[in-house]
């Protein structure tokens, strides 16, 4: 069977419970960021120290690096989806099997060599003081293909979500250069819009007429699941916590996109086919009303 490419959309109703998926032992208290890089495509932080064990892992996996992904807007930017819901961004923590292999390069040649932990970012009304430690370093790597010492005290434990139940599946690295076991925490961490927008000011390695682009987005779209790909989860809490709001938010975004399409048709045909333009603007008003009612209902549910 073909290799399962990453990222994917995780359908919570199809995920399989597995009694072997015990809580992970996360030992980031000794991890220290050494350098931060603008690779021209993403932000990468290299680490010394720190490892994960326990759960279903056969031994310790050493932390190597952290990668950050985002989108043009705050309402999308994660690589992985939960029930077709995209979060504002995603952090990937890359680990390798140091006990079994002599180096990261050797480990990535094997399907048990790499473990990648995924943490979702969700824009909220409050700044994340721990995530700000990363944001404060971005001015030193604004140009593409630059790196700088990470010159701030930073504790990676503080970026872990409040709930550590997880999904897992065998996929690939985002570049598809190696197999990797993914561990995905569906509970996001909250950050502020201003913090995420700072990443969009970084310069890309791509250019047009000699002028560099900004890295306004760098997330990847999900790949279709292979017939033999299995996604497992570690607890019932995941299913209850992710299904309803994720689908509702996605549906609201879809309605909003449809409204914008109808409005663009109205602007396009108002001087020509007035009948078509009137139909389009009627749909705009209808969709606006539906979105307003859904937004009020969703706000009441969050308050309750």
Swiss-Prot record:
Location within or outside the cell: Virion membrane
Signal listed as a keyword: no
Subunit structure: Homodimer; disulfide-linked.
Post-translational modification note: Apparently non-glycosylated.
Keyword Disulfide bond set for record: yes
Family assignment from sequence similarity: Belongs to the alpha-carbonic anhydrase family.
Keywords on record: Disulfide bond, Host-virus interaction, Late protein, Membrane, Transmembrane, Transmembrane helix, Viral attachment to host cell, Viral envelope protein, Virion, Virus entry into host cell
Stretches assigned to the Intravirion side: 295-304
Any one GO MF annotation of this record: zinc ion binding
Designated name of the protein: Cell surface-binding protein OPG105
Role this protein plays: Binds to chondroitin sulfate on the cell surface to provide virion attachment to target cell.
Taxonomic classification: Viruses, Varidnaviria, Bamfordvirae, Nucleocytoviricota, Pokkesviricetes
Inducing or repressing factors: Expressed in the late phase of the viral replicative cycle.
Residue spans crossing the bilayer: 276-294
Top-level taxonomic group: Viruses
GO cellular component entries: membrane; viral envelope; virion membrane
InterPro entries, alphabetized: CA_dom, CA_dom_sf, Carbonic_anhydrase_a-class
Virion surface side: 1-275
Domain Alpha-carbonic anhydrase: 1-235
Any GO BP annotation: symbiont entry into host cell
